Amino acid sequence: MASGKEIKGKIASVQSTKKITRAMEMVAASKMRKAQERMTASKPYASRMRQVVAHLANADLEYRHVYLQEREVKNVGYIVVSSDRGLCGGLNVNLLKNVVKSAKAWEEKGAKTSYCVVGSKGMSFFKSVGGNVEANITGLGDTPHLNDLIGSIKVMLDAYESGAIDRLYIVYNEFVNTMTQSPKNIQLLPLEAGSDEELKRHWDYIYEPAPKELLDELLVRFIESQVYQGVVENNACEQAARMIAMKAASDNAGDIIRDLQLVYNKARQAAITQEISEIVGGAAAV
């Protein structure tokens, strides 16, 4: 059994770690609330854009944009949204498992895959396992801006327009609630027609100045809005997962401290009992 001094040293060490994890939990909780506000603020725009584009995909347009055209899938692109930092449980692991599973399914059909990776955790993964990374973005921080994403998004859009990729997906973590975050895999291109009955009764549009000019701009803005929404939502998931992970770490540290206190008390009791026995034994010998 370890000495009382050694056990007290371990207790002090775990208490110090608990203070750190507790502080990180509180910071993550604060950041999560701010990230949720950004996510909630951007959702109506992204949702409305998706609805408008779904109507367009259902419509009989005089100009059929390349983003609306289905073609044989030989190359698949993924925009993978991960985090820059760890200590957020299995958030990135589950996300990357989803990407690998989807990519493997396409590769089994004979398609090639390429990636645009957001976040250093995703980049570390693809450096480790390999993968055709066409673009990457790191260091977005806790307040990502659309301007930081546009360049990398354009790389994938240009690849789609040139025929280098035939289908484009975005994979990010969906914020279900504070306790639950799940990977979400959405097809960005070609744009899918809406399946709702309301969307099938699509609107008739009048295009100003012309369908081509309008759609060229609108559809790019739509893709950018969906990627930005994914990044903002993934950031909220990251903070929620980190808060939960740090709370679990703090709780575990508390359990360890209690166990060590019991061990320390037993060691102290044993030492006192031994001293009493020695005194009694010495007195009896006299």
Curated annotation (Swiss-Prot):
GO molecular function, one term: ATP binding
Gene3D superfamilies reported in the protein's UniProt record: 3.40.1380.10, ATP synthase, gamma subunit, helix hairpin domain
Stored Pfam families: ATP-synt
NCBIfam families: ATPsyn_F1gamma, PRK05621.1-1
Annotated organism of origin: Alcanivorax borkumensis (strain ATCC 700651 / DSM 11573 / NCIMB 13689 / SK2)
Subunit structure: F-type ATPases have 2 components, CF(1) - the catalytic core - and CF(0) - the membrane proton channel. CF(1) has five subunits: alpha(3), beta(3), gamma(1), delta(1), epsilon(1). CF(0) has three main subunits: a, b and c.
Annotated protein name in UniProt: ATP synthase gamma chain
BP-aspect Gene Ontology terms: proton motive force-driven plasma membrane ATP synthesis
PANTHER family: ATP SYNTHASE GAMMA CHAIN, ATP SYNTHASE SUBUNIT GAMMA, MITOCHONDRIAL
Keywords noted in UniProt: ATP synthesis, Cell inner membrane, Cell membrane, CF(1), Hydrogen ion transport, Ion transport, Membrane, Transport
Membrane topology: Peripheral membrane protein
PROSITE patterns, sorted: ATPASE_GAMMA (PS00153)
Function: Produces ATP from ADP in the presence of a proton gradient across the membrane. The gamma chain is believed to be important in regulating ATPase activity and the flow of protons through the CF(0) complex.
Location of the protein in the cell: Cell inner membrane
GO cellular component, one term: proton-transporting ATP synthase complex
InterPro entries linked to this entry: ATP_synth_F1_ATPase_gsu, ATP_synth_F1_gsu, ATP_synth_F1_gsu_CS
Entry's family note: Belongs to the ATPase gamma chain family.
Coiled-coil regions listed: none
